[in-house]
Amino acid sequence: MVTLGLDASTTCVGYAFTENERILDMGFIDIKKQKTPKEKVFKVLEILNNISYINNIDKINIEDNLSGFAGGRTSQQVIVKLAKFNAILCFVLEDTFEIEVKNINPMTARKCVFGKARIKGIKAKEFVKMKVEQMYDTSKWCKETTRGNWDKRNIDMYDGLVMSLYEKKA
């Protein structure tokens, strides 16, 4: 059973394909250059459609886009823009693949995958990076910047992986 996990923002979409907790493929899609939500969604679809595992997916999990804004540091405009993009992306994915897209709270997914959602004093992104790298050798999928540094967009890929590994305990 192949699961596609996604972490979508309006500039970058992290994705991961997993089967039985094994990573098949993962990466991130830079959509900064696309102007409209429609262009961004179709860019994501174009890239995903070129990945061989796309025809085998039977689950799609996407990070719930409004969960991370409890701190109040994000403007309403940004939240609305992200919600609009996520809604369009989910609709197009469901329509294209005829699979229900599940919106998953990132804290719930982390707790399920790692046994805990966070560690006090460690930022969520650092926690995810640390835990994913303890579980897997991700070196073949991680990208570097032109200066040879770890590309921070890899974290979106890691978040996509957490979504892909999430399995609701019935």
Regions found by a protein language model. Give the residues of each.
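Phosphate- and other anionic-substrate recognition elements at nucleic-acid/protein interfaces
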Residues: 1-170
